Amino acid sequence: MYSKCLVSRTFVLAALVLLTGFIVFGQEPAAKVSPAPSNTPVPHGERIKRWFEMDTLSIGTRFRHITTNVNIDSADILQFQLQARGRFKFDKKGKYSVSAGVYTGSSITSGWGNTGLGTGGPQTNLYVKQLFFTAKPIKQIEINIGGIAPYYGENTEITAYDNDAFFMGERLTIRAPKNLYFDEINAVNGHLGDVTRPSVFHRFKRLDESNYHQLMVRKRINKSVAFSADYTFEAGRDTFRQGVKFSIPRFRAVDSMRFENYQRVDPEKGYGFAISGEKTFRKKLNLNGGFARIDTIMFNADRLPRGNRLFAGWNLKMTRELTLSGIWIQGVGPLPTANTPRTRVDVIFAYNILETLKHFGLQ
């Protein structure tokens, strides 16, 4: 029903890029004269980064406890996580590259695998969830094509899409605040589905299909206030989202506050929001908390399904590589079903391998 021709989609995207470049940005500044080559030896890590650069490389383990709406313990489980994403650069500046991301998690809202300890059997699969080409022909324009992760602006996974979500398609990002006021303008066309088939190789066939569109703007007004707004069409459903973040470092109670919400306008109407705040102590300990109201089933954070919930979390940076974090979530008031989680507690220990590689000059 929503299928479109890939050729026509690519043509429209290319035409939009060219039109924007010629009309809005005009002529590019004259090229600067390159300095004479230096005889200083290039470090080994820099030689690697010329061609290959890691964005993320970490492992973690999580204990998760869930109690349902009827006070039944439905999960006491130890899980593990791997996140690895890097890019191959065709040119030294990285204007043209191919990125790939390998992750645990067997669905669109899952980024963890079961160890076999506790509830459920072991899960050992890893999936290439992201694989996409990036082009930055000029400073103001970025194009992504392939298996991509959604972008939320100032919203978070509470009211937008889960941090582990994925889709197939194209995204055009324009960063030209001097010409277009907004810091970022994002236009997306693609297919969002195959929720239990996370491997990008099983989803490449969706590149010639379209059931997901998004138009988003984002703006930082000053050092204290930033906002975003977007319209999303997803498989027949129309949704608007807005988010605003206030940075208030002089306020002793919190460093920042965020309000985010969504309005589903068609076919069924719905509304949800979250308000949250956070405080960091000596760059080591971060405390956060808030309240969320979600009234409809969607691909948002799996730990915050339908219902009203209070949440509080913490993140302790033990060393450059090691972090210990946790979150407590408590449903308040009526919940949709007997099996809906009423209480959830997560405790996470993570090791950032990328920081170790940087320490030894390998990235």
Segments (PLM) and residue ranges:
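N-terminal secretory signal peptides that target proteins for export/translocation
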Residues: 1-8
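Bacterial N-terminal signal peptides
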Residues: 12-21
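Beta-barrel outer-membrane channel/assembly domains of diderm bacteria
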Residues: 26-143, 172, 176-177, 220, ...
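Signature for the C-terminal beta-barrel architecture of outer-membrane proteins
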Residues: 34-47, 52-58, 72-79, 93-97, ...
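Short acidic, glycine/Ser/Thr-rich loop/turn "cap" segments at secondary-structure junctions
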Residues: 114-117, 150-158
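Short, well-structured alpha-helical patches and their helix-loop capping segments
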Residues: 125, 160-164, 311
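Residues on the solvent-exposed faces and adjacent turns
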Residues: 147
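Flexible, glycine-rich linker and terminal segments associated
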Residues: 258-268, 277-363
